[in-house]
A protein has these predicted regions:
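C-terminal outer-membrane/trafficking sorting elements
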Residues: 8, 844-850, 854-926
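Extracellular beta-helix/beta-solenoid repeat scaffolds
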Residues: 1-162, 169, 187-203, 208-232, ...
Length: 926
């Protein structure tokens, strides 16, 4: 037994073998400046005989020195068992790290770790008190516990005695742990964090396993087997984890398996997580890009990184809510372009959390703050298998996440041929696309339910430009359920099998036309439907979203709810054809399938003011949202308005409006808060050069340690000095470049806030969207938390009826969830019994047309106040196509000869000098 007190300097090679080293608590330990070895069952621990219950400092290693542990050595009761220094070499094998605050701290520069195997980092408490060592841990950081007014930002850690904090704690270090047989892998257990790393590059290849990782007194909501945070604007850092597959469980009984955070906008974080097995987690893998403009690259097109692939996750710990509760979750609040594949994973989800929901695999965004625009795919969820049980809420989901694909998720579960399998319980949805998840594809998925699903096997809510193609929806519950504004939804060639209701439109559903009388959407109804094959409830506005079906190939709904359904569902012509958009399954990768935007009938009705009857509930808010959606579509696809006078007049009419101003904010966010390709290329080149130079210097240091002659020592010393000088110049240049980008980004945020302050909202939709934009820019875009008043504002907006509150309602809810972990309840929309069901009629118009109907000879009476030198009458057909334009100038009565037009429903609108009259409908009947 050896007793040690104070700081002992190891200034010559020294070994403890089969020793029991008792270290005086407090500021005592070892400063190693020459080689130091612990082996043969040596135990270094706090002196239990001392008259206090405090930690000792630990072993600090300095300079080009080697620290070796082996053969069942043990380090216990230290603040930092080992603190590695710049250019150290650590060889750590068969060592127990027990009851330490941190096992190995590596924050002082790169060091060698040539051997790291068969170690056990055990945090079982209670730990001793920190006592006089408190000043030595003031720079240790972790994600803040959320709730209240915090937002899981990185903050300093308060010491707790309940369990060890972290096995490895690293910063700006490139960790590379190579493969080991399962029996000799490193084990991290009973800690708040197994491995915690900030910046740098992390590669872990079948090297370590994690068990019983929970926060304990460090708060339930901040913990992970592995936490990696990329927050310094120094270039693209990387995280790669290759697990054991089915050879061993990588994460066992961990509240979170891995949380990977990208928090800087200079360059996306590269990520690849594959072949892990997780048994007993609440959230398996969490890709977190909420703060500071962070983004992820995780596909084979970027340096071989595969995203999240071939993992097996059993998520069954229904603990208090985390920021996200899912087998695999990708949360992206930034306007830049991420590219992540989540593929070939198997997730078994068996817990429910109520309000915020639990999901097998989820992509969560913050529209419109995180919308990079069309033409890109940010997350591609494909070829996965998810089983839901015990009321788990959602299988696969996109929430406020644009530009996402859910495709080819099928086969391999408890019942063959299921991508999502609802085994038991009362789930919400098999596949869910909600809350402004725009520009998405859901194709070639198979959902099977053995117990009823509440919202739908496919549930689509307030999401535009979605394509839902060739999905199989089998089992009780609504097969496909559309609600609220789902403008330009394409629901084609899906199979609804043995559902409660096969196809449901309710809650003011608007999708745009589902086919025409000559080209149908080819969906099929198979089996029996206990309520109805298809339902459009009394809330929907007719004339906007008719569904056309064929009487072949089981494409006719077996039953349609009376009255409203008969005004929504129509038989097509006898020779009608079906168009699936996608020829066959499986759906190809995103680069091979991206249908172009086009002008639809709904676009024309919106542009003409025919989309929402003026007496309909929430008419003002709904019309504003339709206008905003169309403005966005035309802004993102300017060629659509070319040669189209209706669209050109629509753009002219809204020029200078708040819609244009608010969309302008979105455009500036996309352009000014993200890094450009040329900048990324320079950052990557500099980073590659820096990493190579650092490796060269470490190699020279190794040679220096072996050098014997004065000549060799002098030569190597000079080479190292020269390389250090060049490296410092390169690092300074990199930091300067990234610093300039951050300064530009900060200035852009200030400019956007000024731009928003200049907007004077007229209706609540504009008030909400402007305020949520402001809070977004002041918090997550600036890498800051929200205060209590901002959170209260977000909650108030999020709980409004989305029809009246507009796009800001979805964005407020998503932002509140990202800041607190709590998704506010969506507000209810009143007056269900009074919801409008009329098609546009002359009783609502300031124009008068008579007689109506007739064979085509009409008289139009125009109020005097609406006529002028440039007054136009426009005739549109039932599909919204422009049939005829007539200049009426200052005439108050106009005769129309439309006898050459075929039978059908038509619309009449008037465009005057800065005034658009409310349109009316009429019928030609020969």
């Amino acid at each position: 037994t050896v007793y040690s007190s104070g700081i002992v300097t190891v200034d010559k090679a020294f070994t403890f073998s089969s020793a029991n080293v008792r270290v005086q608590p407090g500021l005592s330990g070892f400063d190693v400046i020459k080689n130091f070895t612990l082996n043969q069952n040596t135990v270094v621990s706090g002196n239990a005989e001392a008259d206090c219950n405090c930690l000792w400092r630990g072993i600090y290693v300095y300079g080009a020195t080697t620290m070796t542990t082996d053969t069942d050595a043990s380090i216990q009761d230290a603040l930092y068992a080992i603190r590695a220094g710049f250019k150290n070499t650590l060889s750590i094998k068969k060592t127990l790290f027990s009851r330490n605050f941190i096992g190995i701290r590596g924050t002082d520069g790169n060091f060698f770790l040539p051997a790291f195997e068969e170690n056990h980092f055990d945090g079982v408490g209670p730990l001793k008190g920190i006592c006089s060592l408190e000043p030595l841990k003031t720079d240790i950081e972790a994600p803040e516990a959320y709730g209240g007014q915090s937002s899981q930002l990185i903050t300093f850690v308060a010491y707790q005695t309940g369990r060890g904090f972290a096995g490895l704690y690293l910063a700006n270090y490139s960790l590379n742990l190579s493969a080991l047989p399962p029996a000799t892998q490193n084990e991290f257990s009973d800690l708040a964090y197994g491995i915690m790393a900030y910046d740098g590059n992390i590669t872990i290849d079948r090297n370590s396993i994690f068990s019983n990782i929970a926060a304990g007194a460090y708060f339930n909501r901040r913990t992970a087997g592995v936490l990696f945070v990329d927050r310094q604007p120094q270039g693209p850092n990387t995280f790669s984890f290759l697990g054991n597959g089915q050879a061993a469980i990588d994460f066992d009984n961990c509240v979170q398996g891995m949380q990977i955070r990208s928090e800087q906008a200079a360059a996306p974080t590269r990520v690849g997580i594959t072949h892990t097995t997780m048994d007993g987690v609440q959230t398996g893998i969490f890709l977190d890009a909420r703060f500071g403009g962070g983004e992820f690259f995780g596909t084979g097109t970027h340096g071989g990184f595969t995203g999240v692939k071939d993992n097996i996750i059993d998520a069954n710990l229904g603990a208090p809510q985390l920021i996200t509760n899912a087998g695999i979750s990708f949360m992206d609040y930034s306007p830049g372009f991420s590219e992540v594949e989540i593929s070939d994973n198997e997730v078994n989800l068996s817990y429910a959390l109520g309000g915020s929901g639990s999901a097998g695999i989820a992509g969560i965004g913050l529209v419109p703050g995180s919308d990079p625009g069309p033409g890109v795919v940010e997350v591609d969820i494909h070829d996965n298998r998810v089983t839901l049980s015990n009321d788990a809420e959602v299988g696969l989901g996109l929430g406020s996440h644009p530009n996402g694909w859910i495709r080819n998720n099928s086969g391999g579960n408890a019942t063959a041929g299921n991508g999502v399998f609802v085994l038991s319980g009362n789930s919400w949805a098999g596949i869910q696309v909600i809350a402004e998840s725009n520009n998405n594809l859901v194709a070639c998925n198979q959902v099977t339910a053995l117990s009823a699903v509440t919202e739908g096997l496919l549930h689509v809510n307030r999401s535009q430009n979605g394509q839902f193609l060739r999905n199989v929806l089998d089992g009780p519950g609504n097969g496909a359920h559309f609600e609220f504004d789902c403008d330009y939804a394409e629901y084609r060639c899906n199979e609804m099998i043995d559902n409660t209701i096969g196809l449901l439109y309710d809650n003011f559903a608007v999708t745009g036309p589902q086919g025409t009388d000559s080209i149908t959407n080819g969906n099929r109804w198979l089996g029996t439907f206990s309520v109805d094959g298809a339902v459009a409830d009394i809330s929907v506005i007719l004339g906007l979203s008719e569904y056309y079906y064929r009487s072949v190939n089981n494409e006719t709904p077996p039953s349609v709810v009376p009255t409203i359904g008969s005004m929504w569902f129509f038989p097509a012509l006898a020779n009608a054809t079906a168009d699936c958009l996608l020829d066959e399954c499986p759906a190809p990768d995103p680069l091979a399938f991206a249908p172009a935007a086009r002008i639809t009938r709904l676009d024309t009705l919106v542009a003409e003011g025919l989309a929402v009857p003026s007496e309909a509930p929430y008419a003002e808010g709904r019309e504003w949202q339709h206008w905003y959606n169309l403005w966005r579509k035309l802004s993102e696809n300017p060629s659509l308005a070319s040669g189209n006078t209706v669209m050109q007049d629509f753009l002219t009419g809204l020029s200078g409006s708040n819609i244009e101003a608010l969309w302008g904010v979105q455009s500036v966010i996309r352009d000014s808060l993200v890094s450009k390709a040329s900048f990324l290329a320079n950052v990557q080149f500099n980073l590659d050069t820096i990493m190579q130079m650092e490796a060269n210097i470490l190699d020279l240091d190794s040679l220096l340690g072996l050098a014997m002659s004065p000549t060799q020592i002098a030569l190597l010393t000079q080479q190292i000095s020269d390389q250090d000088s060049i490296l410092n110049v390169r690092i300074t240049a990199q930091e300067t470049m990234c610093g300039q980008f951050e300064s530009q980004r900060t200035a852009a945020i200030a400019g956007l806030l000024t731009q928003l302050a200049s907007i004077s909202p007229i209706i609540v939709c504009e008030t909400n969207l402007r305020r949520v934009y402001e809070i977004y820019l002041l918090t997550v875009a600036s890498d800051l938390g929200a205060d209590s008043s901002q959170l209260a504002e977000l909650e108030t907006i999020a709980m409004q009826c989305p029809l009246g509150g507009g796009l800001g309602v979805s964005m407020a809810g998503a932002l509140h969830q990202g800041l607190t972990g709590i998704l506010p309840n969506q507000g209810t929309c009143d007056d269900i019994e009074e919801r409008g069901t009329q098609k546009p009629s002359k009783s609502r118009s300031s124009l008068t047309l008579y007689p109506n109907p007739n064979q085509g000879s009409f008289v139009v009476s125009i109020p005097k106040e609406l006529t002028g030198k440039h007054t136009l009458l426009r005739i549109l057909d039932a599909q919204g196509g422009l049939v005829k334009t007539i200049a009426v100038n200052e005439a108050h009565t106009v005769s129309l000869d439309l006898t050459s037009l075929p039978n059908g429903l038509y619309f009449l609108s008037l465009l005057g000098d800065g005034t658009i009259a409310e349109p009316l409908s009429f019928i030609i009947q020969h």
